[in-house]
Amino acid sequence: MAYPFQLGLQDATSPIMEELLHFHDHTLMIVFLISSLVLYIISLMLTTKLTHTSTMDAQEVETVWTILPAIILILIALPSLRILYMMDEINNPSLTVKTMGHQWYWSYEYTDYEDLNFDSYMIPTQELKPGELRLLEVDNRVVLPMEMTIRMLISSEDVLHSWAVPSLGLKTDAIPGRLNQTTLMAMRPGLYYGQCSEICGSNHSFMPIVLEMVPLSYFETWSALMV
């Protein structure tokens, strides 16, 4: 999860987030090289007295500044399209969970179980225990098995919301009357925090998300107790 004064992204917990981190570094390096070239050209223009006032035609230069940006865009687009395809691909999920956004809490339903559903509210600051995080803890965590493909069905009962967990690389809009879906797979156990990422009213900041990723045996025990 994030920590104070953090400059980079959160540590990747899912394969998708790892790909997004690699793509971020790839794109950032391209931006750095372009910026360095532009600054170098500007410094030359400011420090040299050479001018080309008689230049009327420069087809070679025009060819370079047409082809080079096209190549750069291709180098950015290809890995981006690959990741977009991976994010939309859903192959035989092991578990399906439906989440509904409300003003201002989340409700969850495990559709593979007959009667496993609950609401998840933020714990008020005055009720927090030592070590718990302000504005991020909930009364009911979403317990999920790790190292398994899980499909999330996301919608809303009232206004626009957005279900987001940064360390898993997830952000999906919750739209009234529309059912969106996304997949997640956590590679290690732990607690993963997120929040509503669409301004949805006065208590928008009080809609945290907490995923508790556990081994399959623990999940089976928990689900049996909940049902």
From Swiss-Prot:
Residues in compartment: Mitochondrial matrix: 46-59
Annotated catalysed reactions: 4 Fe(II)-[cytochrome c] + O2 + 8 H(+)(in) = 4 Fe(III)-[cytochrome c] + 2 H2O + 4 H(+)(out)
One Pfam family here: COX2_TM
Localization in the cell: Mitochondrion inner membrane
A single MF term (Gene Ontology): copper ion binding
GO cellular component: mitochondrial inner membrane; respiratory chain complex IV
Residues annotated for Cu cation A2 binding in this entry: C196, E198, C200, H204
Domain of life: Eukaryota
SUPFAM superfamilies, alphabetized: Cupredoxins, Cytochrome c oxidase subunit II-like, transmembrane region
Mitochondrial intermembrane side: 1-14, 88-227
Chain positions with Phosphotyrosine modification: Y218
Residues reported in the UniProt entry to bind Mg(2+): E198
Keyword annotations from UniProtKB, A to Z: Copper, Electron transport, Magnesium, Membrane, Metal-binding, Mitochondrion, Mitochondrion inner membrane, Phosphoprotein, Respiratory chain, Translocase, Transmembrane, Transmembrane helix, Transport
TM region(s), chain numbering: 15-45, 60-87
Cofactor note: Binds a dinuclear copper A center per subunit.
Record-listed E.C. numbers: 7.1.1.9
Membrane topology summary: Multi-pass membrane protein
Binding site for Cu cation A1: H161, C196, C200, M207
NCBIfam families: CoxB
Protein name, per record: Cytochrome c oxidase subunit 2
